[in-house]
Each structure stands twice: as C-alpha cells, then as structure tokens.
Amino acid sequence: MLGIADMQPRQLAAQILNFALVLSTAFMMWKGLSVVSDSPSPIVVVLSGSMEPAFQRGDLLFLWNRGADTQVGEIVVYNVKGKDIPIVHRVVRRYGGGKTPLRLLTKGDNNLADDTELYAAGQSFLNRQEDVIGSVVGFIPFVGYVTILLSEHPWLKQVMLGLMGVMVVLQRE
C-alpha cells in the first residue's frame, strides 16, 4: 500500500479530486431531495423521546412538503422562530385554511401538554406555510443515532472525516 509521501503528484491529485467528487455528489443528492420534496430539510433525525411510541430517539424521518393541506393526526416537522432545531410533533388542531392561512396546534405523543410553550413569543399556533418544514412520510428506525453521537461528541466528527480522507487517499484504482 502506498503512503501519501510515496504517491506521484498526479496520483495524489486524482485521489483528492475523487474525495471532492464524493462530497459534491452527496451535496447534490441532498439538494435534489430538497427540490423533489419541497422541503429545505427533507431528512431529519428524532432528537428526543417526545414522540414515543410512534418514533424513538435516533429514528431517521423522511419529509414531504408538497401538500398545502395538513390534517389532524398528521405528524409534521416544524421550526420555531429564533431556534435552529426542528421539532417533530403531531397536529392536534387546525384552524383556517382555504382563503385564510392554515394554522396548526401540535403536541408530542409522549407530552402532557400541547406545544404552545415551545412556539415563538406571542405565537399560539403554527402557520402551515411559514413554520412547517414538512410532513413525515416514512422513517428508518435508529439510523439517525450516528447524527446524535456526532452532535453530542464533536471530536467524533473530526475522527470520521480524518478516516474518510485517509481511506480515499490510500484507495488504489
């Protein structure tokens, strides 16, 4: 196996370009999913136990945001103004629709109260158009635990990126 120091400049450049190709392909796939699903974040990870037993911490959720109508009982992912962590909860009430903006009230299945305390200051309901990222259309159990581990232990990100970089550079064609 060749080390980095033993590689010819062209071979090293090819390996670096190969690594860049892998990263850009992943980015293009993410953006493609965003366009198809009409959601800025088409895949999210459940970060808490508020939706148990429907979803467990670490489940990977697939979102769809093409439907403008949301029904009571539907599970949606929304952002709260001023916070950057999406929340996954079930719609328990809906108001308006048609000519007036659709407003939603949500609640976690494992929570005692609705989400009004989680909403932005002065907000009693979610605006379907402005706050909701998408509706859950599918999930894969526990696959998202990698994301949780990476956010709880930041040094793991550096280790994983380093290992991926070494694997790409040392890969033989």
From Swiss-Prot:
One of its GO terms (biological process) is signal peptide processing. It is found in: Endoplasmic reticulum membrane. Catalytic component of the signal peptidase complex (SPC) which catalyzes the cleavage of N-terminal signal sequences from nascent proteins as they are translocated into the lumen of the endoplasmic reticulum. Specifically cleaves N-terminal signal peptides that contain a hydrophobic alpha-helix (h-region) shorter than 18-20 amino acids. The active site is at S50 (charge relay system), H89 (charge relay system), D115 (charge relay system). It comes from the Eukaryota. Residues 37-173 are lumenal. The C-terminal short (CTS) helix is essential for catalytic activity. It may be accommodated as a transmembrane helix in the thinned membrane environment of the complex, similarly to the signal peptide in the complex substrates. Disulfide bonds: none annotated. One of its GO terms (molecular function) is serine-type endopeptidase activity. Keywords: Endoplasmic reticulum, Hydrolase, Membrane, Protease, Signal-anchor, Transmembrane, Transmembrane helix. This is Signal peptidase complex catalytic subunit sec11.
